Amino acid sequence: MQNQRIRIRLKAFDHRLIDQSTAEIVETAKRTGAQVRGPIPLPTRKERFTVLISPHVNKDARDQYEIRTHKRLVDIVEPTDKTVDALMRLDLAAGVDVQISLG
């Protein structure tokens, strides 16, 4: 796996879960002898929703909700075969979306 790079993008609604998952990935990669760059925090996406709480009139009565999507990026620069095997066996939290790309 020489001259390879593994790029891992993580997304989650809870920032504590995503930080815990990135720490597990970085620790696993370093333990198997790979060079790691990151975790790099990417911009947080904020989706806002406004809902009328009145059934008929009173347009001024509204509730506002927000969903924040936190993102992190981890680059594993020189992965070994042990690194790939350890990352495949790694069990992360259920609320974290993981995208892996080889480059």
From Swiss-Prot:
Function: Involved in the binding of tRNA to the ribosomes.
InterPro entries according to UniProt: Ribosomal_uS10 (IPR001848), Ribosomal_uS10_CS (IPR018268), Ribosomal_uS10_dom (IPR027486), Ribosomal_uS10_dom_sf (IPR036838)
Keyword terms of this UniProt record: Ribonucleoprotein, Ribosomal protein
HAMAP family the record matches: Ribosomal_uS10
GO cellular component: ribonucleoprotein complex; ribosome
Keyword Oxidoreductase: no
Keyword Ribonucleoprotein: yes
Any one Gene Ontology molecular-function term assigned to this protein's record: structural constituent of ribosome
Family (UniProt): Belongs to the universal ribosomal protein uS10 family.
Origin species: Tolumonas auensis (strain DSM 9187 / NBRC 110442 / TA 4)
Subunit field text: Part of the 30S ribosomal subunit.
GO BP term, example: translation
Signal peptide location: none
Protein's UniProt name: Small ribosomal subunit protein uS10
